[in-house]
Design a protein with these regions (language model features):
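Short beta-strand elements at the ligand-binding edges of bilobed clamshell
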Residues: 140-154, 303, 309-313
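Short, ordered loop/turn segments at secondary-structure junctions
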Residues: 13-15, 41-47, 79-80, 109-112, ...
Length: 338
C-alpha cells in the first residue's frame, strides 16, 4: 500500500497556449495514479498572493480525462506576479501552506518560470516546484530543435489564416499587413510566413542594433511593394513580428497617434496595445502619397485567435509527456535543493 501524500497544486500563468488542458490532464492522471490529491488553482498567482485559498477546485481523473482535446485553460490564467513585493510572496506561501500543498506544478512562460523558482527558494524546501514551459512565442531556452508547446498549433492555425488573407489580397488586388504575436522573438511570424508563402516576413532578429526607427521598417515594406509592381503584381501579404515594436525607440512610439504605453505586472510593454499594423500602414501609404500614388492596404493582427485553438496532435502528445514528466520529477529524490 502506498503511503498517502500531501496535495499537489497546479496553476497556469501568462498568456494562453494550445495544449494547456492536455498538460493539466496528464499531470492529474499521473498524480492520482500515485495516490496524490490534486488541487487546481484558478487564475495563476492572482488569488494566492492575496492570501486567498477559496479559488481552487479538486481535480480528479473523471474531471480531466477528456480535456486534452479542449483549447484554453480550465483553470484560467493570469499574469499576477508574486515576486513584485515580499508581502505578496509571503501571502502566497501562507496560502499554499493553508491548502496543504507540498508540491506545485506551474504552467507558463519565462515570467511564470521565474516566479516558480522564487516560490521554491522562498519556501526553503517546503514546497517543491516543477515548471512546464509554455508559450506560442517559442522564445524559451529549450534544447535545440525543441519548440515550446503551443507553438506548432499556433503556427498551423496562423498559416491557414494567412493563406486566406493571401487569397483575399490576390482577389481584391491589394496588400495585407499582418502583425503576428511573439514578443521579442520572431519564430511564430517566420514560421507562419514561410509556411504560408507570404510575400515577405519581417522579424526583429533581422536588426542587430538595439533600436531601430519606424522608417526603416516602413521603407522595407515600401521596397517590397515596388518590387512586386516591377514583377507585374499589385498585391501581396507582409507578415510582421510584433517584436518589431520592442525594437522601436519608445519615445518615437509614444509620440504616435493612438499609441498608449501599457505595462503588465512583470514590467513588459503590452505589445497587444500597440497598433503596429495601423502605424506601418499609415506610414507606407504616406510614402506613396508623396508621389501622388494611392495604395490600398488592409491591416490585420494575429495572436488572440491562435492562443486558445484546439491543440493539434503534436502538441497534445508533447504536453501529455510534459505533464507526466512533471509528476515524475516531483516524486524523484531531490538533488541540489531542487
Amino acid at each position: 500500500m502506498k503511503t498517502p501524500r500531501k496535495r499537489l497544486g497546479i496553476l497556469v500563468g501568462g498568456g494562453p497556449a494550445p495544449g494547456i488542458n492536455s498538460a493539466i490532464s496528464a499531470t492529474v492522471i499521473e498524480a492520482v495514479n500515485e495516490e496524490i490529491e490534486v488541487i487546481g488553482i484558478y487564475d495563476g498567482y492572482e488569488h494566492l498572493l492575496q492570501g486567498r485559498t477559496d479559488m481552487v477546485r479538486p481535480l480528479t481523473i473523471d474531471v480531466v480525462s477528456r480535456i486534452h482535446f479542449q483549447g484554453g485553460s480550465i483553470l484560467r490564467t493570469s499574469r499576477a506576479n508574486p515576486t513584485r513585493h515580499p508581502d505578496d510572496m509571503q501571502r502566497t506561501l501562507q496560502a499554499l501552506q493553508a491548502l496543504d500543498i507540498s508540491a506545485l506544478v506551474t504552467i507558463g512562460g519565462d515570467d511564470t518560470a521565474f516566479a516558480a523558482s522564487e516560490v521554491a527558494n522562498a519556501s526553503n524546501g517546503v514546497v517543491r516546484v516543477a515548471h512546464i514551459p509554455k508559450t506560442i512565442d517559442n522564445d524559451l531556452p529549450l534544447p535545440g530543435g525543441v519548440s515550446t508547446f503551443g507553438f506548432e498549433t499556433a503556427r498551423h492555425v496562423g498559416t491557414q489564416l494567412v493563406r486566406n488573407l493571401m487569397e483575399d489580397a490576390r482577389t481584391t488586388n491589394r496588400w495585407n499587413f499582418v502583425v503576428v504575436m511573439g514578443r521579442k522573438a520572431g519564430h511564430l511570424a517566420l514560421g507562419i510566413g514561410k509556411a504560408a508563402g507570404a510575400t515577405l516576413t519581417i522579424i526583429p532578429e533581422e536588426f542587430p542594433q538595439e533600436r531601430i526607427r519606424l522608417n526603416e521598417v516602413s521603407r522595407m515594406l515600401e521596397a517590397a511593394i515596388l518590387k512586386r509592381r516591377v514583377m507585374g503584381s499589385e498585391h501581396g501579404v507582409a507578415v510582421i513580428a510584433e517584436g518589431i515594436s520592442e525594437k522601436l525607440d519608445p519615445e518615437e512610439l509614444a509620440s504616435m497617434p493612438g499609441v498608449e504605453m501599457v505595462y503588465d505586472p512583470y514590467g513588459h510593454i503590452r505589445l497587444g496595445e500597440i497598433p503596429l499594423t495601423t502605424i506601418l500602414k499609415r506610414q507606407v501609404q504616406d510614402h506613396f502619397a508623396a508621389r501622388h500614388d494611392k495604395l490600398s492596404i488592409v491591416d490585420v493582427t494575429l495572436g488572440y485567435e491562435l492562443r486558445c485553438a484546439q491543440a493539434i496532435p503534436y502538441d497534445v502528445d508533447y504536453t501529455r509527456t510534459l505533464g507526466y514528466g512533471a509528476v515524475r520529477f516531483l516524486l524523484s529524490k531531490p538533488e541540489d535543493g531542487r
